Amino acid sequence: MISSNYSYPLDPSWNTEDITKVLRFLNQVEHAYENSIKVDDLLDSYKEFKKVVKSKAQEKQIDREFQRTSGYSTYQAVKAAQQQAKGFISLGR
C-alpha cells in the first residue's frame, strides 16, 4: 500500500528555483492522477522540469523513485498529455 506521506526525489545540489520547478512538475503529475489537469499546464511544467533535469538517465531515475513512493508515473503522465495534445487529462485509478 502506498503511503499518502511520501518524499519527493530531489537532488541536494539543486538551488531553490530548481527545486521549485521540479516540485511544480511532480505536483502536476499528482493532479493528473488524483483529479484532472490541463494538458498545457502539465506540458509547461515538464518543459521547466527539463531545464533542471537535462539527462534522460536522471529523468528516469526520478520517475522510478517517484513512482515507487507515490504510485504515480511521470512518464505515463507526460505521454498521455502529449497524446492528448489539448484539453484535460485524468489518469485516476
Swiss-Prot record:
Coiled coil: none
Gene3D superfamilies linked to this entry: BH2638-like
Domain of life: Bacteria
Classification via HAMAP family: UPF0223
UniProt record similarity statement: Belongs to the UPF0223 family.
Name by which UniProt lists this protein: UPF0223 protein SAG0995
Lineage: Bacteria, Bacillati, Bacillota, Bacilli, Lactobacillales
